[in-house]
């Protein structure tokens, strides 16, 4: 695959990328990690480059790992929130994108609405990269696929069980990535909460082509039987506080605890994109226990960001 095909492209969601391109990002993530631990703390492919971080929503992992990633690639970051820019005073997303394109080499945007990303990409002349939206979280999915490859030695044929909120943005990106990479994904979620239908349709078609599968069930124990990976996320995301009580009651049977992990048959790892609401979607004994790959997964965000930025930033 020619790397020039990726240079300068937006990354709004993984539906725009082939399985081969996603796999290359995943493998480069682990290569970046190997080089880091071999002593290459700086790989200066972004020397002289500036990456803007435009965040409507606060972050620990995304912001810090991106700032460190750009530094380890020899570039530098400019962090912005709407209140610190004219976006907070009514300047349009389109005008902001045009202006930032004159100063920066790429924009990573963490936004409340996916439509904001799409509008930014329409008017920017530099890559716009999704650092999280209400619909998807592609950078997280790249790190997650790298973690699975690192822990299981393969992606094709891996059984991933996602237990919890079926409309979760991270799940959407796991569906888009995993279906193109040959994973067997089972989502256990209440019938009232389903993945975005457009994303589900794309994932089902991609799974047919890759030899993977996608299934939606309501029983968490059915989902995790024989699973290689059990994955969950918070039940109430930022901006959903008004529906917190109703959602928590609905999702209580979907808590990942030791009993559920033992039902996998003993070979599964546990993954969570963090932050975790301990005692809600996952218990301490799971996230801190022998199943947990969460801390390696969190570290791999750093290396995934290096991989993606090194491929996309011109």
Curated annotation (Swiss-Prot):
Protein name: Ornithine carbamoyltransferase
Ligand binding (L-ornithine): 169, 233, 237-238
GO annotation terms (biological process): arginine biosynthetic process via ornithine; citrulline biosynthetic process; L-arginine biosynthetic process
Gene: argF
GO annotation, cellular component aspect: cytoplasm
Sorted UniProt keywords: Amino-acid biosynthesis, Arginine biosynthesis, Cytoplasm, Transferase
Top enzyme category: transferase
PANTHER family reported in the protein's UniProt record: ORNITHINE CARBAMOYLTRANSFERASE, MITOCHONDRIAL, ORNITHINE TRANSCARBAMYLASE, MITOCHONDRIAL
Gene3D superfamilies from the UniProt entry: Aspartate/ornithine carbamoyltransferase (3.40.50.1370)
Source species: Aeropyrum pernix (strain ATCC 700893 / DSM 11879 / JCM 9820 / NBRC 100138 / K1)
Catalytic activity: carbamoyl phosphate + L-ornithine = L-citrulline + phosphate + H(+)
EC number: 2.1.3.3
Cellular localization per UniProt: Cytoplasm
Signal peptide: none
Positions that bind carbamoyl phosphate: 59-62, 86, 110, 137-140, 273-274, 301
Family recorded in the similarity comment: Belongs to the aspartate/ornithine carbamoyltransferase superfamily. OTCase family.
Taxonomic placement: Archaea, Thermoproteota, Thermoprotei, Desulfurococcales, Desulfurococcaceae
Function (record text): Reversibly catalyzes the transfer of the carbamoyl group from carbamoyl phosphate (CP) to the N(epsilon) atom of ornithine (ORN) to produce L-citrulline.
GO MF annotations, alphabetized: amino acid binding; ornithine carbamoyltransferase activity
